[in-house]
Amino acid sequence: MKVRNVDNNFVAAIGKSGIYPFRLNICLYFADGFLIDAGSAFILKKIKNFLSDKKVDCVGITHVHEDHTGAAAWIKEHYNVPVYLHEASIEEAAVKSSIPLYRFLTWKNRKGFAADPMPEFIETEKYRFDVINSPGHHPHHVVFHEKNKGWLFTGDLYIGRRQAVAFKDENISDSINTIERLLTLDFDTIFCGHSGIIKNGKEKFREKLEIFLHLRDRVNALQSEGLSFEEIDKRLFPDKNIWELISRGEWSTLNMVKTV
């Protein structure tokens, strides 16, 4: 994993997960004993190496998807520390994941683990991270805000300014509402679960919001003409994204159209 020093006792680690052509970036953030997200089981050995010289005090997981929880069971067993997760996802986390082949080739299945209910904030000696519910990519997604530093750890809420497809659990209207709330916060830097460290984060979120709102306007206009969601999808997205084909519709433009 590539490791980058961000601040005093705060490092970011980026690793590649999956086999070709499914390889994608995964980012972990370790700040003063607090680990944000637990990567995928595919890179478990790399995560173990990354943490080998670190004292982990607790883990905060942005959401229960397998690319953010892959090392959670090992961390819980090895360090015996709290692994915090949205309370509504604790039952799901306790059971080993069962995922389609394309996701297995990218992330692998994670073991079940005993998660701890997410507190309102997580405080270390140097930092305080406020926990903010942020539904959109997942209904039980959270972000972590270190307001004194202007940092926002966004899990899978941001990824990039323009979104090509939406996951089956995703709700774009929820993402819009969440982004509008987050834009009232004081932050400059986004720490994304896959795209890494992004400066001018508030402006990037504004751009993403505008793109979503423009899509909503287009969908509403076509609905007013009597088009169905499927017809609107074909009109707005005539060429299918490769991930839509590989995932057999788990990721789709249609879900963007339906939920915006």
Ranges and model annotations:
Residues 133-135, 139-218:
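Metallo-beta-lactamase
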Residues 27, 107-128, 132-168, 251-260:
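Mobile, glycine- and charge-enriched loop segments
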Residues 36-39, 57-65, 83-87, 133-136, ...:
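Active-site neighborhood of phospho(di)ester-bond hydrolases with catalytic His/Asp-centered motifs
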